[in-house]
Amino acid sequence: DVPGHTKGLVTLLHKKGIKLLHIGVNGASALPEVPECFLWKNGDSEIVVIYSGAYGGAYKNEYIDEILYFDHTLDNRGAPAPEKVLKHLDDIRNMYPDYIVEAGTMDDFAEILWEVREKLPVIENEIGDTWIHGSATDP
């Protein structure tokens, strides 16, 4: 939900074994100039980042066969009713008839992308945040 982060986050996430960060922002946010998917490095630490200019939707990377589809409610809303979740799964199956559609975790998709991380563009810079400023925002 936050448009940018300090690269210090890379080290913190890497130390916890997190391999994938998905950043989705609302339409009013100014977007940084970064690839849709990249390997973000800070020293010896690295994570894969998927940067989306919206909440939810499909993400397909050219180096893998799988598609990640985020289907959730918008900003500051609760979880959908179970019936809506099942209907959304049916809708997604109709959109991707050649795929097996199943619920999964970010970690499931992270493991798949991690295998091709050397092929991704590399970013080693900060990703400026248009919402927060100052030294207190940098761990």
Stretches with model-predicted labels:
Residues 1-139:
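Catalytic-domain carbohydrate-binding cleft regions of carbohydrate-active enzymes
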